[in-house]
């Protein structure tokens, strides 16, 4: 398992932009991979922007939710 940061696709900008969001995954992802990431509004297009994110960089209040 590893932590990755993703950015969601923004149709208005026709780009993957905005804040990075952290997810835990067992998939062998690399930077630049395009994925479908779960959100409360359903799965959304996203791009992996960072892999192997250290737990120390994730807010401790969020870690149990990942």
Language-model-detected regions and their locations in the chain:
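Terminal, basic amphipathic appendages of nucleotide-handling enzymes
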Residues: 2-66
């Amino acid at each position: 398992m590893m932590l990755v940061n993703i950015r969601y696709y923004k149709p208005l900008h026709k780009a993957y932009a905005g804040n990075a969001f952290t997810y835990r995954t067992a998939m062998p992802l690399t930077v630049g991979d395009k994925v479908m990431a779960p959100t409360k509004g359903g799965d959304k297009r996203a791009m992996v922007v960072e892999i192997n994110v250290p737990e120390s960089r994730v807010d401790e209040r969020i870690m149990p939710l990942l």
